[in-house]
Regions:
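Conserved Rossmann-fold NAD(P)-dependent oxidoreductase catalytic core, especially the SDR/UDP-sugar
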Residues: 1-25, 29-32, 36-39
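Mid/C-terminal beta-alpha module of Rossmann-like enzyme folds, strongest
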Residues: 89-164
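Conserved beta-loop-beta element that borders a ligand/cofactor-binding pocket
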Residues: 26-49, 62, 68-79
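Generic structural signal for alpha-helix termini and adjacent loop/cap motifs
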Residues: 63, 67, 93-96
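C-terminal, non-catalytic macromolecule-binding modules
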Residues: 160-176
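Substrate-positioning beta->alpha
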Residues: 49-59, 73-95, 112-118
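Hydrophobic residues at beta-strand termini and immediately following loops
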Residues: 39, 105, 175
Length: 176
């Protein structure tokens, strides 16, 4: 199995090197009689990605969770796949036991960079800042929310202090 990138189609050094690497592995497999599958993978996101490396989701989550302000360089359209969905696609391909020189892994969601940042800002404002679970409308949003949560500084965030309300009848706190 060889992991390549949807960047293969772009005219940049990274994309060219990924495509060339995949093609070299295809040649090797043919000459050596080996099996080879070259996966072309969209933008992967999920818990514990490396910020400031190759995932805008990881970078935005890390910055927001640490009270930094992310910036958008290019507000492009992203084709995304959650890491768990990618693992399922890889396992499915392994179970087939066949070579596939160019296996395009389908993206499972799309988002403009600005829309992605807006959702993450809502998660921070609701969950991290106020302790409110945000509205989750689909699987993508659930995966994105869970990704955001892994970047929070858990030691300083929890336990959450509840606001006590008191009147002549007694005291109570609101919890989820």
């Amino acid at each position: 199995l060889f992991s390549s990138s949807s960047q293969e189609e772009r005219d940049n050094l990274y994309g060219k090197s990924k495509k060339e690497g995949r093609e070299l592995m295809i040649d090797w497999a043919e000459k050596a009689g080996g099996k080879f599958t070259g996966m072309i993978i969209p933008n992967v996101f999920g818990p514990f990605g490396h910020p400031n490396y190759n995932s805008v989701v990881a970078t935005f989550c890390h910055k927001l969770a640490h009270n930094e302000t992310p910036t958008i360089e290019v507000d492009g359209e992203l084709k995304l796949i959650y890491v768990g969905e990618l693992v399922e696609a890889i396992l499915s391909e392994i179970r087939k036991g066949k070579s596939n020189a160019e296996l395009v892994i389908a993206h499972t969601s799309e988002s403009k960079v600005s829309q992605l940042l807006s959702l993450l800002e809502c998660y921070k404002a609701a969950y991290q800042d106020k302790g409110i679970i945000p509205s989750i409308n689909n699987t993508f949003e659930l995966n994105l929310f869970n990704t955001f949560r892994c970047y929070m500084d858990i030691a300083s965030h929890f336990p959450v202090k509840f606001v006590e309300h008191t009147d002549p009848r007694g005291s109570f706190v609101e919890i989820i």
